[in-house]
Design a protein with these regions (language model features):
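Intrinsically disordered, low-complexity basic tails and flexible linkers associated
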Residues: 1-91
Length: 91
């Protein structure tokens, strides 16, 4: 988990650069995301409450890009990304 958290900003910047994501899209969709948990190679990412309705869009547009980049930059051989809302996050 520490590797993903330590490298989170680098992961986001790499996704932006490698996949030519515009500043507007990056600041809207990716920058607000936070790593919530890493368990058994599942990286759970917390989506801000104002973006919860867009979890499906994040899954369609950015999930695979994040998975590939996380694996490349952390050395994790295989990982999955799961987006959750603040309501789904255990307190």
């Amino acid at each position: 988990m520490d590797k993903v958290i330590e490298k989170w900003d680098e992961i986001l910047q790499t996704v932006k650069r490698d996949y030519n994501i515009s500043d507007v899209a990056f600041n809207t969709w990716l920058k607000p995301l936070e790593v919530y948990d890493v368990t058994d190679n599942v990286i759970t990412i917390l989506v801000p409450s104002e973006q919860v309705v867009l979890i499906n869009l994040l899954n369609k547009k950015y999930k695979l890009l994040l998975q590939v980049t996380i694996c490349e930059l952390t050395g994790i051989s295989e990982c999955d990304v799961k987006f959750i809302s603040p309501d789904e996050a255990p307190q």
